Amino acid sequence: MGADTKESESINIWDTIDRAEEDMYIAKTLGRDEVKRDTINSIINNLHQNNPREKEHSIHVKRLCQNMAEILNLSDIDTKKLKDAGYLHDIGKIVLESRLLENNYSITDKEWNEIKKHPIIGYRILNSFDHTIDIAELVLNHQERWDGSGYPKGLKGEEIPLLARIIALAESYDRKLSANCGKRKE
């Protein structure tokens, strides 16, 4: 609800009403943005609550991305994108069964194909919100590999956006350090 005060008789009542209405629309817009942010936070928090390793991984990847951005002298805008995308890169895993995230057993080809969809799901989630649309493409491409063996598009070399390559490197480094890699059943 908007509100304004008519502070003197010389002020037109309709101007006061117009200001109150404008304040109301601003409040609604800001509230909508807050709800959108809360939605993303709720999704990632749900994923992290169900799998604490994913939370640790997100934090580590974000930190590694920030460090690499500083070393590479990236702009403040690219650094923020990289940190945000680094933290949210696996948000698409929210649709996976928790046991697939545990990585302590061999998985079937069918399960592997389900896991490989997480960048697409993450892209769809982040592309739905104005405040994350600029990182959606990075999340989509974070599993691409320089030699073209990645997924979902099989991009290779410089077809992969630089920031997505940095996320892939940070993620791979963290996974190797934490020895959380799932083993695909051959």
Where are these regions (language model features)?
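HAMP domain helices
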Residues: 20, 32-43
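A short glycine-enriched loop-to-beta-strand structural element that forms part of the catalytic core
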Residues: 1-21
